[in-house]
From Swiss-Prot:
Sequence segments annotated as region (Disordered): 1-58
Full protein name: Large ribosomal subunit protein uL15
Compositionally biased residues, Gly residues: 21-31
GO annotations of cellular component type: cytosolic large ribosomal subunit
GO biological process: translation
Record Pfam families: Ribosomal_L27A
Organism listed in the record: Vibrio parahaemolyticus serotype O3:K6 (strain RIMD 2210633)
InterPro entries associated with the record: Ribosomal_uL15, Ribosomal_uL15/eL18, Ribosomal_uL15/eL18_sf, Ribosomal_uL15_bac-type, Ribosomal_uL15_CS
Database matches in Gene3D superfamilies: 3.100.10.10
Amino acid sequence: MRLNTLAPAAGSKHAPKRVGRGIGSGLGKTGGRGHKGQKSRSGGKVRPGFEGGQMPLKQRLPKFGFTSRKSLVSAEVRLAELAKVSGDVVDLNSLKAANIITKNIEFVKVVLSGEINKAVTVKGLRVTKGAKAAIEAAGGKIEE
């Protein structure tokens, strides 16, 4: 086998449409675009969501809700994810170092989801009742 003998498998490639090359080709004259209209012109595209001048669905429906600014800097951490932290002290910086939370997170709450087998000390994080019981059952402790 040599580089000059390499070829794609038979039937795996389709020949491109050659438009505007005579009536006999089946794609002559209008080139498969039909007659007149916006879609037949060069650059003739209709932007997504455009409904021909009718008020679009996006504008017919009412606005609602908002994005809470607090949710952008808050995160929940599952109990099982605490095992991924190297060392036995879990705080905001150690969670960021272990890539469990992103760098813009400022508030973390530990929730009961999964299991924890190693004893860890949780510092400066909020903890749910169930998660607190599970951490203490594993030999860990919570510090404010």
